[in-house]
């Protein structure tokens, strides 16, 4: 049996799995084949458990394909494989980081002179970390829409600077990106009390740089930002058209990466779609791992409501949670805001929380949602997005240029309205409910396999929910 067995498995897995999944879970594995046993080494327990749960059947099937009856046994371990085996079985890297000119500094954090505060008033470490202690992994509600993002953030928290660097999270407003940033920061500081973790909105970075320039303290600014263990920046798209800020962040990024210091960035869009940001920065954003967070599906929305109610020590009936979740779909923030309103009204009036009570408490919000998202609106939005006519969506045409948008519109109608499958079918030229069901399943499958379809779905959800 050749020592290249794992390389053959890798090639097949790369073809079979979505690129994000392969990069996140399979690429970090190291392999050693010895005494008819294939040992797979994972960087941490989290990756090991995930691979064993999600991909062991894929791996075993490939071993049977390649080895026939002489299938090696499979063993999982945490750590690195023996040094003697690394030259032949290490997982190949596909990203090579160009050399950079910035020289990282390992000096202690310095007082930013642009803040004009006496040194004695500042903590020695972690000053102005801005990490919110309330946002942790334990109270982040996981679902299919955010599962990969949470898993990636968890790995980074367990191995900052060594797992995925940078980690780039993108998605619409209110989907949990900021929560994950804080969760990573909290986790790192729990493991290492004096860790130098800084969270900020991108506009704060710009403001700090402007103050540093005004106070002739740009060198202090550089030393401060290049001395952190983890830099967590929210809404990186606000760097757009700020050339000096981009220039400074470019060199800060390079210095941190060379020093194996963790960088996590968030944006409301895919890196290459951020207008007004230099190509060299957008390229670097993709050096590590880029993961999308999508609007939560029904089950996750219900779980979020139940979790929030539990935190407020409120008994929320299941049917009420489903009623709210079916009608408010755009983001987590909207869900939590609606529940806060329901709880406040219940406290003020002393009434029990029922569907009728919720319908009354949220009547303006529910009326707005029903007005905004209709099948007609979905059809018009999808037709405009794909540059076809609404009549094409209703026609019998089956060419891919029409069939795929039609399937997308049907899937969106199921996701964003309360219409039944037969009602959706009727609205699309009198189609059978099984056609609608097939369309929904097809789009769900394609969202897993195709970055373009995933982006189209997310973009249309944002447009229809805004």
Curated annotation (Swiss-Prot):
Residues 85-122 have a biased composition (Polar residues). Residues 82-122 are annotated as: Disordered. The keyword RNA-binding does not apply. Residues 1-85 are annotated as: Domain I, interacts with DnaA modulators. InterPro entries: AAA+_ATPase, Chromosome_initiator_DnaA, Chromosome_initiator_DnaA-like, Chromosome_initiator_DnaA_CS, DnaA_C, DnaA_dom, DnaA_N_dom, DnaA_N_sf. The keyword Nucleotide-binding applies. Residues 85-129 are annotated as: Domain II. ATP binds at residues 174, 176-178. One of its GO terms (cellular component) is plasma membrane. Pfam families: Bac_DnaA (PF00308), Bac_DnaA_C (PF08299), DnaA_N (PF11638), Hda_lid (PF22688). HAMAP family: DnaA_bact. This is Chromosomal replication initiator protein DnaA. It comes from Proteus mirabilis (strain HI4320). The gene is dnaA.
